[in-house]
């Protein structure tokens, strides 16, 4: 009997200890959950509380509010001021340009023919040589009813120390066309917009008017003199043709 009594007492003590530990663990768990709920905006007064659980939702982000926040976080937006720049492209037939690489089985231009080229570049007032053009034209089609051709052109305009501009788009030999300004370097970093191409004498004389956006500063006066009205008879100033110091920009591209 004594042994049975001791065993029952041991079992009772063990059970009480287990119950006490479970109760403490339960309270710790509730405290942990309570802290987690608070992190999500949920409050709880614990078990047995008569007050209901409350939830504080975040404000709904409407499209208008999201757009407003995005606009507010935008820094240094691209400048939208339009600056005009005019240049003449002239081929004196002394640069072994253009080259015609035939792919189409025709004596005329046909789809896939390639025309790499490089020509001389002058300011719009024809007083200074600034550099060269360099790029590639891909023949898209011959247009017999207009006695001309359509090219897809990708090329750059080099301005010596000032940097360069790159363009891409249609080059039509029978009418004016517009190409996209795809970028630039030097003072032309960040440039975008479009350029108007006017064919004066095919393929040796062209006039361009750039409508530049995205530039950080105004164009230098040296590049934006009053342009000579485009015509097939225009010629660069003698100083520019002879590459005299007064007729070229700094480190002009040749």
Curated annotation (Swiss-Prot):
Q: What is its EC number?
A: 5.3.99.6
Catalysis: reaction(s) = (9Z,13S,15Z)-12,13-epoxyoctadeca-9,11,15-trienoate = (9S,13S,15Z)-12-oxophyto-10,15-dienoate
Q: State the conditions that upregulate or repress this gene.
A: By dehydration stress. High local and systemic induction by wounding.
Q: Which intervals of the chain form a coiled coil?
A: none
Which InterPro entries does the UniProt record give? Allene_ox_cyc, Allene_oxi_cyc_Dirigent, Allene_oxi_cyc_sf
Q: Where is this protein's transit peptide?
A: 1-78
What is the annotated localization of this protein?
Plastid, Chloroplast
Q: Per its UniProt record, what Pfam families does this chain match?
A: Allene_ox_cyc
| GO process terms (BP) | jasmonic acid biosynthetic process
Gene Ontology terms for molecular function? allene-oxide cyclase activity
Q: Where is this region: Disordered?
A: 44-79
Residue spans of biased composition, Polar residues class? 65-77
Q: What does this protein do?
A: Involved in the production of 12-oxo-phytodienoic acid (OPDA), a precursor of jasmonic acid.
Q: What else is known?
A: The four allene oxide cyclase proteins (AOC1, AOC2, AOC3 and AOC4) are encoded by duplicated genes. They are very similar, and most experiments involving antibodies do not discriminate between the different members.
- Mind telling me what this protein is named? Allene oxide cyclase 1, chloroplastic
Name the gene that codes for it.
AOC1
């Amino acid at each position: 009997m004594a042994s049975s009594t001791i065993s029952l007492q041991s079992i009772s003590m063990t059970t009480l200890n287990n119950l006490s530990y479970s109760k403490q663990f339960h309270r710790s768990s509730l405290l942990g959950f309570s802290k987690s709920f608070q992190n999500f905006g949920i409050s709880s007064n614990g078990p047995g509380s008569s007050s209901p659980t409350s939830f504080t939702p975040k404000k709904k982000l409407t499209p208008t509010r999201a757009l407003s926040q995005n606009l507010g976080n935008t820094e240094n937006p691209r400048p939208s001021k339009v600056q005009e720049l005019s240049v003449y492209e002239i081929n004196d037939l002394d640069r072994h340009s253009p080259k015609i690489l035939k792919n189409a089985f025709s004596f005329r231009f046909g789809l896939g023919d390639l025309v790499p080229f490089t020509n001389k570049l002058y300011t719009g007032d024809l007083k200074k040589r600034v550099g060269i053009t360099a790029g590639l034209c891909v023949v898209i089609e011959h247009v017999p009813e207009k006695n001309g051709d359509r090219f897809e052109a990708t090329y750059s305009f080099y301005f010596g120390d000032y940097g360069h501009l790159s363009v891409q788009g249609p080059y039509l030999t029978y009418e004016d066309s517009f190409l996209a300004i795809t970028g630039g370097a030097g003072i032309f970093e960040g440039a975008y917009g479009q350029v108007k191409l006017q064919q004066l004498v095919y393929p040796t004389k062209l006039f361009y008017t750039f409508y530049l956006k995205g530039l950080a500063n105004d164009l230098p006066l040296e590049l934006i003199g009053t342009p000579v009205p485009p015509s097939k008879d225009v010629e660069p100033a003698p100083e520019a043709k002879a590459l005299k110091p007064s007729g070229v920009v700094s480190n002009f591209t040749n």
